Amino acid sequence: MKCMASDSMVSLGNGLSYPADKIRKVKKIIVGAGGDGGDCSRFLEWATRDFKEPPPKWKGSKEEESFLALVLKADGLYVYAPSFPEPEKVNAPFFAIGTGGEAARVAMMLGKTPEEAIELACQVDGYSGLPVQVLEL
């Protein structure tokens, strides 16, 4: 089963947070993003237009990545950053981004499912929050 999972918490600079969708199924792919909320939203909207238009203008400069995105296709997982000319294939069985990404990767290394990994990451990362969202390819 190929899937993408995410937490639901978006945090603002003033200490406020709210639940939102961070992953989206678009035709035969799944996309997700973590980082600056505005740039994540712009990336997800760009994906719904099949990446046909030029990339949106990102908040951060190319030297400082304001967000990272994942693109799950039938042939594998790809990571995208504003400084990349195109998504780069991840040659690993799984990957995770965002503030809870390291915790989630460790959990998956220990055999947890993506959903379980995010639940655990939410317990140790103050910027990650439930519920977990899961989309299957």
Would you name each region that the model predicts?
Residues 1-137:
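N-terminal nucleophile
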